[in-house]
Amino acid sequence: MASRLLRGVGALAAQALRAHGPRGVAATRSMASGGGVPTDEEQATGLEREIMIAAQRGLDPYNMLPPKAASGTKEDPNLVPSVSNKRIVGCICEEDNCTVIWFWLHQGESQRCPNCGTHYKLVPYQMVH
């Protein structure tokens, strides 16, 4: 029993000695190349990395961000991306409105919401593959 205990203590002592450098200073391991905790950019891989790089360039390749609101006039309509030549659009019309007015938006000239008159325009959108 005592020999088993001494063997365990000896193994722990050897492990502690291996952890220290040649001058008795404890060796440290870091995950990042410069030391410390890596940033999100250093750690991201795959699709997450592609999205982060695109976001740094100001792009939104997977339509994750909310659409940019325009004034909704005929000269400055709200742009609606679509992969086809028509798309169904919902307009809330007023901030405190609890119903959504749905209507079809076709490619070409800007169209108005039948209820409030806000202008929308369909723009072509290429999906990222």
Swiss-Prot record:
One Gene Ontology CC term in the entry: respiratory chain complex IV
Domain of life, source organism: Eukaryota
Sequence positions that bind Zn(2+): 91, 93, 113, 116
CDD domains: Cyt_c_Oxidase_Vb (cd00924)
Location(s) in or outside the cell: Mitochondrion inner membrane
GO molecular function per UniProt: cytochrome-c oxidase activity; metal ion binding
Membrane topology term: Peripheral membrane protein
N6-acetyllysine modification, residue list: 68, 86, 121
Quaternary context: Component of the cytochrome c oxidase (complex IV, CIV), a multisubunit enzyme composed of 14 subunits. The complex is composed of a catalytic core of 3 subunits MT-CO1, MT-CO2 and MT-CO3, encoded in the mitochondrial DNA, and 11 supernumerary subunits COX4I, COX5A, COX5B, COX6A, COX6B, COX6C, COX7A, COX7B, COX7C, COX8 and NDUFA4, which are encoded in the nuclear genome.
PANTHER family: CYTOCHROME C OXIDASE SUBUNIT 5B, MITOCHONDRIAL
Protein name stated in the entry: Cytochrome c oxidase subunit 5B, mitochondrial
Species this protein is from: Rattus norvegicus (Rat)
Upper taxonomic lineage: Eukaryota, Metazoa, Chordata, Craniata, Vertebrata
